[in-house]
Design a protein with these regions (language model features):
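A short, polar/charged loop/turn motif at coil->beta-strand junctions and beta-hairpin connectors
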Residues: 7-10, 92-94, 131
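Non-heme Fe(II)/2-oxoglutarate
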Residues: 1-88, 108
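A short coil-to-beta-strand element that immediately follows conserved catalytic motifs
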Residues: 87-98
Length: 142
């Protein structure tokens, strides 16, 4: 008997470095946002010791002085999403929401999932050179 292999449940992870994003602006925006908005209580579900912004579904809800930079960032994300979408053959996708996390020394993210998401992503603005851990992915096939 000859066996044929097929891939049924792959886990594909895309990674890249986007040099078009103004990280300095995003870092300043994140720190400003943290200073004016306390972390919502639901953020304790996934963040341990850090700050987690509210979820941003509507760019127009962002303060005017931050909007241009956030829109430019979102446009870069949209370009990446479109590239992945075409490669894997998904129908047109719509960017749903994002949030900002700030984790200082000793803070971390708990394992969590993003239900009902076709794609999820992480964009690192600033990472110290030491005392940081790697991102981890788990797959629950139960």
């Amino acid at each position: 008997m000859t066996l044929k292999s097929t891939t049924w449940f792959p886990t594909v992870i895309y990674a890249g470095l986007n040099e078009n994003v103004d990280r300095k602006f995003l870092k300043e925006t994140a720190l400003y946002w943290q200073s004016v908005e306390p972390a919502p209580t639901y953020s304790m579900n996934s963040n341990d010791g850090g700050w987690h912004s509210r979820s941003i579904e509507i760019i127009d809800a962002v303060e005017d002085k931050l909007k241009d930079g956030i829109v430019a960032f979102k446009n870069e994300l949209d370009n990446s999403i479109e590239e992945v979408r075409k490669e894997i053959g998904f129908p047109e996708l719509k960017f749903q929401n994002f949030w900002i996390n700030i984790n200082g020394y000793g803070a971390s993210h708990k394992f969590h999932n993003h239900p009902d998401s076709l794609l999820s992503g992480v964009f690192y603005i600033d990472i110290p050179n030491d005392n940081t851990s790697n991102i981890e992915f788990q797959r629950n096939d139960d």
